[in-house]
């Protein structure tokens, strides 16, 4: 006897419901990226407190990378990303 797999039938949805589902997905992705940014910034600030220049430089590069990805995906606006990067670079320069 062969296995019978029941495929989920596509359901025709009203546009408002579809937009709601898409917004939930986007909201979840945005939340994930924002959390990654906060975690990376926190680890960068901790490395500044420790005073390890090589570690803080690596952490700063990591934060830059995540912020650039967020700007590319539209999670943050470009101006916010630039402002955040500038402030973090200023903190790194002040500690150096």
Curated annotation (Swiss-Prot):
Chain segments annotated as transmembrane: none
Coiled coil: none
One example of a Gene Ontology biological process annotation: translation
Region called Disordered, residue ranges: 1-27
GO cellular component, one term: small ribosomal subunit
Alphabetical keyword list: Ribonucleoprotein, Ribosomal protein, RNA-binding, rRNA-binding
Disulfide bonds: none
Pfam entry (one): Ribosomal_S20p
Superkingdom of origin: Bacteria
Xref: InterPro entries: Ribosomal_bS20 (IPR002583), Ribosomal_bS20_sf (IPR036510)
GO function term, MF aspect, one: small ribosomal subunit rRNA binding
Function description: Binds directly to 16S ribosomal RNA.
Entry-linked PANTHER family: 30S RIBOSOMAL PROTEIN S20 (PTHR33398), SMALL RIBOSOMAL SUBUNIT PROTEIN BS20C (PTHR33398:SF1)
Family designation: Belongs to the bacterial ribosomal protein bS20 family.
NCBIfam families in the record: S20 (TIGR00029)
Protein name: Small ribosomal subunit protein bS20
